[in-house]
Amino acid sequence: MVTIRLARGGAKKRPFYQVVVTDSRNARDGRFIERVGFFNPIASGQAEALRLDLDRINHWVELGATVSDRVSALIKEAKKAA
């Protein structure tokens, strides 16, 4: 099953997440089909905290991809900010 979820990057104590479309059987930070955005939970000042390609996310959801709970909340936040 294809899912849209977060893949963790960054350093210890300084997380940075990529929003990726991947097969649910792949490892959290493993192979992915497409990168559709990023989320920086510790962004401050002028740093961009969230960027999502909503067109591509909608495309994958129409094809049957499931969305993780956290990514669903981020999509809601991005739509509110737009």
Swiss-Prot record:
PROSITE patterns cross-referenced by the UniProt entry: RIBOSOMAL_S16
A Pfam family reported for this protein in Swiss-Prot or TrEMBL: Ribosomal_S16
GO BP, one annotated term: translation
GO cellular component, one term: small ribosomal subunit
Keyword Ribosomal protein: yes
Keyword entries, A-Z: Ribonucleoprotein, Ribosomal protein
Classification via InterPro entries: Ribosomal_bS16, Ribosomal_bS16_CS, Ribosomal_bS16_dom_sf
One Gene Ontology MF term: structural constituent of ribosome
SUPFAM superfamilies (alphabetical): Ribosomal protein S16
Keyword Nucleotide-binding recorded: no
PANTHER family with a match to the protein in the record: 30S RIBOSOMAL PROTEIN S16, SMALL RIBOSOMAL SUBUNIT PROTEIN BS16M
Family indicated by similarity: Belongs to the bacterial ribosomal protein bS16 family.
Record-given protein name: Small ribosomal subunit protein bS16
Organism: Yersinia enterocolitica serotype O:8 / biotype 1B (strain NCTC 13174 / 8081)
